[in-house]
Amino acid sequence: MNTKVTLAGVELKNPVMTASGTFGSGAEYSEFVDLNRLGAVVTKGVANVPWPGNPTPRIAEVHGGMLNAIGLQNPGIDVFVKRDIPFLKQYDTKIIVNVCGKTTEDYIEVVERLGDEPVDMLEINISCPNVKEGGIAFGQDPKAVEAITREVKRHAKQPVIMKLSPNVTDITVMAKAAEAGGADVLSLINTLTGMKIDINRRTFAIANKTGGMSGPAVKLPIIGMGGIATAEDALEFLMAGAAAVSVGTANFYNPYATVEIAEGIENYMKKYQIDDVNQLIGCVK
């Protein structure tokens, strides 16, 4: 049974990864989670200099979810390179570094610094909604999305994932802009907007199918995220066309979520005698 997926030439042992900002840089969860079981660890955002983050309180529970405004607090690239990369290299999982910045130059500085480090991919965060400078300004203007993507690609030695903001009128426009700028992969929230898939029948749960932006709108691999807490959630995203999934908020209330989801996908494949997880990707159209 094959659970491996490939993103921009990088092979992951399974399609389950952590969502940036919900898993630290791996060490924080390593007592609960065998990081070797994950397709990839996506680190918390890393900037060129330390960021203090937003004032407290930063987190509030709401019905059905959680509000957070951490502000991308991080110790900066120097500490990350010395402390976090050596820790992650102990594990048999891919390392994806989330890069944040306030200007194009900030992003480029981090990308260049990571060029010779043993990391597998870069995720460029232009989607964070709670930093007053940078982040969201890039993510809401298609010309800016294309420009920052092109600049990052020009300086990057690793494949580039562009993490897009959901807070736009049409995320397809932003996705196409990132594609035009040379992105290798996209991270997208709400891939399944307004859609429910019956994973047992592998078809839409209702006849009047509708959905988000997975499919032919862009030709790049998509990492789906947003509300993934169970294997069934992950399978829906895969069947809708996501090449991999990121697990976020679920990590806060269930530190075992990522491994449980990976195991759940394997159990589903055994139950339905599916030899290759890639057979599930985009199987519902």
Placement of each model-derived feature along the sequence:
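Alpha/beta enzyme core
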Residues: E31, L35, K102-I223, E232-A242, ...
